[in-house]
């Protein structure tokens, strides 16, 4: 069954925070045992959204889902243990995430639409290299990850365009059976830390037919401190 975010109260003006409306659609789909959450054509600003079991977030052609850069709109990273582990507050773990899921199964992001991280509002060229415009740009704003999916089994991302991430684009941690297919990641090629695809302590990951343009790692298999302790 399909659940339109418009019917849940989303407004396609690119200004209104539609997080509550989108989350209502996700929750309704999950409560019914699964379904597709439809983002139609239009520009939808949103704070963090948490996907759930058996839910597909589907962006139709012409849809643009925009990440808020307001810290109040963004979910912080889940912390491990009692918070005393120094890895929990290490650099790179302070920005929160826009789209994610935790300890879920059968989660999909699909469609011909775009997820826009507003990285072009974060990275500033101050001409530090005297006109060559090749050095990494300055970062002067709050920078959430575009996506963080932790301990998700059967996770698929296909066909979408991920544009101008402000930090890591697609971070998967402790996930199993991951398929990334036919996506485009179009980030600033001078943006700091705007990695493309980061499988972190994951198993059975297949990345195919993707175009990835970033200012940092395009695809990097890694084992970060916090996640290696968990997985």
PLM segments and residue spans:
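Extracellular/periplasmic carbohydrate-active domains that bind, remodel
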Residues: 1-231
């Amino acid at each position: 069954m399909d659940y339109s975010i418009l019917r849940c109260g989303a407004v396609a003006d690119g200004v209104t925070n539609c997080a509550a409306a989108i989350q209502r659609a996700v929750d309704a789909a999950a409560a019914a045992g699964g379904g597709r959450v439809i983002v139609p054509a239009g520009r939808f600003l949103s704070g963090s959204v948490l996907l759930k079991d058996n839910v597909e977030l589907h962006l139709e052609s012409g849809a643009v889902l925009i990440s808020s850069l307001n810290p109040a709109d963004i979910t912080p990273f889940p912390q491990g243990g009692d918070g005393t582990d120094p890895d929990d507050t290490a650099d790179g773990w302070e920005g929160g995430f826009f789209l994610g899921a935790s300890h879920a199964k059968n989660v999909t992001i699909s469609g011909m639409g775009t997820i826009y991280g507003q990285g072009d509002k974060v990275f500033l060229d101050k001409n530090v290299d005297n006109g060559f415009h090749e050095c990494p740009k300055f970062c002067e704003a709050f920078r959430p990850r575009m996506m963080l999916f932790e301990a998700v089994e059967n996770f698929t991302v296909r066909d979408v365009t991920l544009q101008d991430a402000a930090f890591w684009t697609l971070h998967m941690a402790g996930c199993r059976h991951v398929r990334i297919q036919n996506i485009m990641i179009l980030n600033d090629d001078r943006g700091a830390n705007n990695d493309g695809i980061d499988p972190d302590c994951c198993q059975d990951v297949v990345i195919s037919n993707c175009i990835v343009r970033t200012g940092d790692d395009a695809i990097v298999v890694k084992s970060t401190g916090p996640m290696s302790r968990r997985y």
